[in-house]
Every structure is written in structure tokens, then in C-alpha cells.
């Protein structure tokens, strides 16, 4: 965790420095203005920590306001940084062309103020749209055929939510929309593939009751994500159970002879991927191969040793980058980063884009989703 935070704040601070230098070049402001801007940026760099401290001190409303401001700023400054890099590459291309062709393109290359405002306008537009998109919950439908579903059943509907990140930003309003969407598609089984909660639970304990409104014939199941461990695993588990979920921790459950649902803890519990693999290997011995088996695992990292046992793995974690084009970074760490994948030995993996948001309350070209998976009996 400490390495993660050090890396994050170094990158986040570097991005602020880049934007500060762009503003300085565009406006040639005096020392007083530069110090003021620098102080504001320093506050925004430290704001995520300030939000957590404010929340822990019991000032929920203040923490909620600060969270929305600082995380919206976080998204905005990342977007400004990316558009700034694109503009810099464009200017470099013009400069190089001028040198190669002996042409004077200095009027295009040197207009710092124009490019600053271009980046600013692009950032504002993306942020406004991104806040809107983050609230537009999309229902994704998926049909998987198998000969393992009993004839008399024919079809079973699994609904997946993931990465809701209940907390200061994702609250009652968003939970109501999620619950409404889930109820509308009438699941046989509801699963949560981790990161249901994101902060201290004093402020969100009452939200568990909304999930209790979802009734399914065969139950609700959940696994832990990394944020359950960051929040505090005991209290996160307590909240999840109050919400009506059965938490699968290295456990497999036979659902009336129709399907098997298995789940493993996120690797954050021990910090080693190998720990999760051991859990999967042990669970494999408990699975009936003649029955359709679904593995709930927060991170989309299929383990080769269990591919022959599980027919379908449901995961989340990646958010599909949440803000385009950050999925490019996500792809560096996760080969399967969003959507439906066919794995070796005929197994499948589905990676949910996330039902909520983490950090910035913004999504751009990566809308939140509730996934509806119909597992149907193959026609003879």
C-alpha cells in the first residue's frame, strides 16, 4: 500500500506541475499569482488524504463536498494533462515539419495561450459529459449456451454488479438506481464481484437495506475486492452480509443441482497472487464437473490450473479504465480488461466495467453496467 501511495502522489504531483507550467507559459503571471496557484494545487494534491481525515473525524457532509470537488478535480486534471500531451505532440510535429521543409510554423507552435484554452475547453466538455455518463447505468446482456443446465430448468439468469464503491460519492441516489435496474431484469441469482464498499462504513450502514429489497429465487452471493481490505475487512463483511449477500471466501455452493457458485478472496488479503491460486486449486476438488460452475473472482486473472473446472469466471476491478484512454494503462496490467473472453479448454471470462465509480465521479466512454447473464440449455 505504501508503495502504491508513494507512486500515486509522485505521478499526481507531476501532473499538477505540468499543468502549472502550462498555465505559467500561457499567462506569464507574476509571483503572487504563481504562489496562489501553487498553493491551491498543493491542497488538491493532498485533498484525498484530507477527505479521509475529515470523514474519520465524523464530518460527513463536509467530507462529501470535499470528495466531490477533489475527485472531480482529479479527473479534470488528468484529462487536461492528456489533452496537453496531445497538443504538445501536435506542436512537435509542426515544428519538425517546419525544420524539414524550411517553413516557418512558429505562429502555430508558439501559441501557448491558444493551446491552454483548447485543453481547458476540451477538459470542461469531457468532465460535464463524464459526470452525466457515470449516472447512465447500462444493462449488458450476455447469453451462454451449455449442455450442463438440466432439461427441466432450461435457463438460469445471473445478474452481476461489481465495483459499486459505496461511500461519500456513491450514495443513496445511485444505490436506488442500481436496485431498480436489478429488480427490472428479475435475476435468479445476484452476484457482486468485489469492491462493494469504499470508505469507513459509519456513513453508509443504512444503505444495506436497499440491497435487501432485491429478492432472488436462488440467493445473492459476493466476494471481496481489494477495497474491502482497504476499508477494513471485518466491517466490510458485516455490511455485505447485512445487504443480504452470502460471502464466498474460498467456498463453493451447490445451487439446487443447477449450477455451482464458487468464490475466492481478492489477493489484497495476503498481497500475493499465489494465495488466490492455492484457493482455486483447493476449490477445484469440491466442484462437480458435470454441473455448470461459476467462479467469482475480483481481478480478471484466470488461473490456468482451474480453467478445466470452471465454466465461467466473473470479475471486475478494471473499470475499463473509467476515463478514456486510461484503458490503455489497464491493458498493461490485465490482458482481459473488459467484456467477454473465451479462455482455454472452453471456459469463459466476463469482466464487468464497474457499476459505480472510484475516485472521480466521471466515466468517459466506459459507462457503468449491470450485467445480465443468461445461461441456457443447448438445443438438442
Show which residues each predicted segment covers.
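Non-catalytic terminal accessory segments
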Residues: 1-135, 380
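Alpha-helical transmembrane signal-anchor/signal-peptide segments
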Residues: 135-149
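Soluble catalytic domains of enzymes that build or remodel membrane lipids, polysaccharides, and related
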Residues: 145-380
